[in-house]
C-alpha cells in the first residue's frame, strides 16, 4: 500500500510538466508578431511599401482579434473538449500564416492576420485557463510571461538577417513551423472537465462573482497604468535630452530585465506569501514611475526604465495566479484575455490625451499612472485573504 501511495505523485508529474510545456510553448508563439513589432513593421514598409496607417491597421487587427477571441470562447470554452479546440486553433493558425507568407494583396493580408490572431487568441485563452488548473499557477504564469518575452527578444535579434534573405515570409513561415513543432502538445491540455465540476458547487457563486469583478478591475488598472507609461517612455528620454542610441540600448537591456522579472516570479512561485510579492513588485513599479519625473538624467532614466520593465513582468504572474484562485473553470481567464487587450488599448489612448492636454508634459501622466497602479495593488491585496483552495493543494 505504501508503494502504491508513493507512486501516484510520480505518475501525475509528467502530466503537470507536459501541460506546462504546452502552456509556455503555445503562449510564446501566439503573440510573437506583436513582440517583434519594430522589426516586422520595418520590413512591411520596405518590402510591401506599406505606409504607417496600413501597418497600424495590421497590428491593430492582430491585437484586436486576439482580444475578440474571448467572445466566441464564452460559448465553446465550457462545452468543447479543450484538446479538440487546441488542435483546430493550431491548424487555422498554421494555415493563415502560410497563406500570409504568399499573399501580395493588402486586404487579403489584413484578413489573414485577423484570422491568425483569432486562432492564436483562442490558444491563449486555453493557455490561461489551463494554467489556472495547475497546482502552482504562480510558477506557470511566470513561465507563461517569460516564454513570450524570450521568443520576442530572440526574434528581434534573428529577424533582420532572415528578412534580408527571405523577406517578410520568414516571419510568417517561421511562426507556422514553430506552431507545427508545438502541435503535439495540444494533447497535453486538460479536457475542460474542470468547468462542469466547479459549476456543480454553486454555494459560493455570488461571493466568487464579487471577487472576480475586483480581480478584473485590478488587472485592467494594472495594464492601463503600465501601457500608458511604457508607450511614451521614449518621449521622456527625448524631452530629457538623452541620445536616441543610448535610450535604445537601455530598452534593449530592459527586454532582458523583463525576462528576468518573469523568471524570478516563476522561481519563487508559492514559496513566499503572494501579498508580500505583490507589495514588493508594485513598490518597484511605482518607484520607477516616480523616478521618471522632472526630466531625469541618463543614470536615473536607465534605473527607472530597467526597474519598470523588471517589476511589471514580475508582478503579472501573481496577478494572474490571484485570478486563477478565484475561478478554475476558465471563464474568468477568458474574460482576462479581453481585459488585457482592452487595457493595452486604453492606456496609450488616455495617456496621449493627457499629454496633449498638458502641452506635451508627462508629469501628470506619471502621477496618475502611479495612483492607478496603487489602486490595482489595493484591489489585489483585498483578494489575498486566506480562503480554502483545494484545487491547488
Task: Please describe what each predicted stretch is.
Residues 112-147:
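Cytoplasmic helix-loop-helix junction between adjacent transmembrane helices
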Residues 38, 211-252, 256-259:
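Extracytoplasmic gate region of multi-pass secondary transporters
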Residues 69-82, 261-274, 355:
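Helix-to-loop junctions at the C-terminal end of transmembrane segments
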Residues 273-319:
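C-terminal transmembrane helical hairpin of 12-TM major facilitator-type secondary transporters
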Residues 68-105:
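Conserved MFS/SLC helix-loop-helix module at the cytosolic interface between two early adjacent transmembrane helices
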Residues 134, 143-191:
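Helix-loop-helix hairpin linking two adjacent transmembrane segments in secondary transporters
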Residues 326-361, 369:
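A late C-terminal transmembrane helix in Major Facilitator Superfamily
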Residues 51, 161-177, 352-373:
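A membrane-interface helix-boundary motif in multi-pass transporters
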Amino acid at each position: 500500500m505504501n508503494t502504491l501511495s508513493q507512486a501516484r505523485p510520480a505518475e501525475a508529474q509528467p502530466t503537470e510538466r507536459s501541460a506546462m510545456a504546452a502552456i509556455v510553448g503555445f503562449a510564446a508563439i501566439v503573440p510573437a508578431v506583436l513582440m517583434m513589432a519594430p522589426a516586422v513593421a520595418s520590413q512591411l514598409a520596405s518590402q510591401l511599401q506599406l505606409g504607417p496607417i496600413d501597418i497600424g491597421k495590421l497590428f491593430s487587427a492582430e491585437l484586436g482579434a486576439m482580444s475578440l477571441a474571448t467572445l466566441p470562447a464564452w460559448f465553446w470554452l465550457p462545452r468543447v473538449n479543450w484538446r479538440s479546440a487546441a488542435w483546430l486553433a493550431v491548424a487555422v493558425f498554421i494555415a493563415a500564416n502560410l497563406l500570409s507568407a504568399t499573399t501580395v494583396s493588402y486586404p487579403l493580408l489584413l484578413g489573414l492576420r485577423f484570422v491568425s490572431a483569432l486562432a492564436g487568441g483562442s490558444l491563449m485563452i486555453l493557455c490561461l485557463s489551463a494554467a489556472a488548473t495547475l497546482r502552482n499557477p504562480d510558477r506557470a504564469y511566470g513561465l507563461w510571461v517569460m516564454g513570450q518575452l524570450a521568443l520576442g527578444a530572440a526574434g528581434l535579434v534573428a529577424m533582420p538577417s532572415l528578412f534580408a534573405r527571405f523577406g517578410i515570409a520568414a516571419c510568417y513561415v517561421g511562426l507556422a513551423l514553430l506552431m507545427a513543432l508545438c502541435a503535439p502538445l495540444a494533447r497535453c491540455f486538460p479536457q475542460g472537465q474542470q468547468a462542469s465540476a466547479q459549476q456543480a458547487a454553486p454555494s459560493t457563486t455570488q461571493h466568487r462573482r464579487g471577487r472576480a469583478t475586483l480581480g478584473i478591475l485590478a488587472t485592467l488598472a494594472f495594464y492601463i497604468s503600465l501601457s500608458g507609461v511604457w508607450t511614451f517612455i521614449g518621449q521622456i528620454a527625448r524631452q530629457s535630452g538623452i541620445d536616441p542610441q543610448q535610450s535604445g540600448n537601455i530598452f534593449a537591456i530592459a527586454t532582458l530585465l523583463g525576462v528576468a522579472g518573469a523568471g524570478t516570479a516563476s522561481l519563487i512561485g508559492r514559496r513566499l506569501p503572494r501579498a508580500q510579492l505583490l507589495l514588493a513588485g508594485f513598490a518597484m513599479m511605482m518607484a520607477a514611475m516616480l523616478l521618471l519625473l522632472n526630466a531625469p538624467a541618463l543614470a536615473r532614466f536607465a534605473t527607472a526604465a530597467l526597474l519598470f520593465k523588471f517589476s511589471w513582468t514580475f508582478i503579472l504572474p501573481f496577478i494572474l495566479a490571484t485570478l486563477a484562485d478565484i475561478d478554475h473553470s476558465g471563464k474568468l481567464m477568458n474574460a482576462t484575455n479581453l481585459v488585457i487587450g482592452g487595457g493595452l488599448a486604453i492606456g496609450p489612448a488616455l495617456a496621449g490625451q493627457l499629454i496633449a492636454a498638458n502641452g506635451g508634459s508627462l508629469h501628470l501622466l506619471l502621477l496618475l499612472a502611479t495612483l492607478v497602479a496603487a489602486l490595482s495593488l489595493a484591489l489585489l491585496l483585498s483578494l489575498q485573504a486566506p480562503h480554502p483552495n483545494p484545487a491547488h493543494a
